[in-house]
């Protein structure tokens, strides 16, 4: 049990910009840290829903800006960094070895900037076109994406240069993430008639499938790329599917 507690606070400290109340680290809890990503997603989802609620008191364009930026702000733009790195690598259309090298390059290329602008415009337009947004299903969108992230990192073949390449696959963390994903998708559909968490999961899976084929495996950057697009898909489903 202590490894799960360590894993939760390790995940909070690593994947959220909100100050962690207990900064701890235990190497044996690394897999539990990945499995606790959905719990971190719950915190991110609550912040996102709070920003959506606050946006009702702002002019529509400013409210949409707050809603669009909230999931990026709460993570300190961590996953956006992965999104940009993957876009740079994939859109270079070079051989696999070069794409993997570009993925680890700290420089920001033109493809990354263009894709970031398009991503922002899409997310802003989604919320600009929204009426009243149901908050509880929205809370579950980041949970769904991070449950998918935990499953992907703990089951898929990693890129050799990935920080997760030496991590053991399978086990209780995979079961936990799978149960969380199944539970929240079912809960949202049954209680609120919303398939937003399912749409977020579908967006994540498709993005990982594409990036995996282009880059030869799974990595933290690939997960950030897929998570960013998954959250956009979940928000779009919530706003546009009425």
Predicted segments with their positions:
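Membrane-embedded alpha-helical segments that form the functional core of polytopic membrane enzymes
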Residues: 35-87, 137-140, 194-213
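Structural signal for membrane-spanning alpha-helices in multi-pass inner-membrane proteins
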Residues: 14, 48, 52, 71, ...
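Membrane-proximal soluble regions of multi-pass membrane proteins
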Residues: 1-25
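C-terminal ends of transmembrane helices
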Residues: 19-25, 78, 97-98, 150-160, ...
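Solvent-exposed interhelical
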Residues: 92, 147-181, 215-218
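N-terminal beta-alpha supersecondary unit
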Residues: 7-13, 27-52, 166-170
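Acidic (Asp/Glu-rich) catalytic motifs at the cytosolic membrane interface
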Residues: 70-108, 211-230
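Multi-pass membrane catalytic core of lipid/isoprenoid biosynthesis enzymes
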Residues: 30-48, 89-133, 137-138, 175-188, ...
């Amino acid at each position: 049990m202590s490894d799960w507690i360590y894993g939760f606070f390790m995940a909070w400290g690593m994947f959220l910009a909100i100050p962690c109340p207990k900064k701890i680290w235990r190497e044996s809890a690394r897999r539990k840290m990945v499995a606790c990503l959905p719990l971190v997603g719950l915190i991110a989802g609550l912040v996102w829903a709070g920003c959506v609620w606050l946006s009702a008191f702002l002019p529509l364009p400013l409210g949409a800006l707050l809603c669009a930026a909230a999931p990026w702000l709460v993570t300190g733009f961590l996953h956006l960094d992965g999104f940009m790195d993957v876009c740079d690598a994939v859109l270079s259309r070079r051989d696999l070895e070069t794409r993997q090298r570009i993925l680890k390059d700290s420089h920001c290329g033109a493809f990354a900037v263009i894709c970031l602008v398009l991503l922002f415009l899409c997310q802003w337009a989604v919320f600009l076109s929204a009426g009243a947004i149901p908050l509880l299903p929205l809370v579950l969108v980041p949970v769904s994406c991070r449950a998918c992230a935990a499953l992907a990192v703990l089951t898929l073949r990693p890129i050799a240069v990935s920080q997760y390449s030496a991590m053991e696959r399978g086990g209780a963390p995979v079961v936990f993430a799978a149960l969380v994903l199944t539970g929240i998708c079912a809960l949202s559909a049954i209680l609120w008639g919303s398939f937003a968490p399912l749409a977020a999961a579908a967006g994540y899976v498709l993005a990982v499938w594409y990036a995996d084929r282009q880059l030869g495996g799974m990595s933290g950057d690939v997960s950030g790329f897929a998570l960013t697009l998954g959250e956009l898909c979940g928000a779009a489903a919530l706003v546009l599917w009425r």
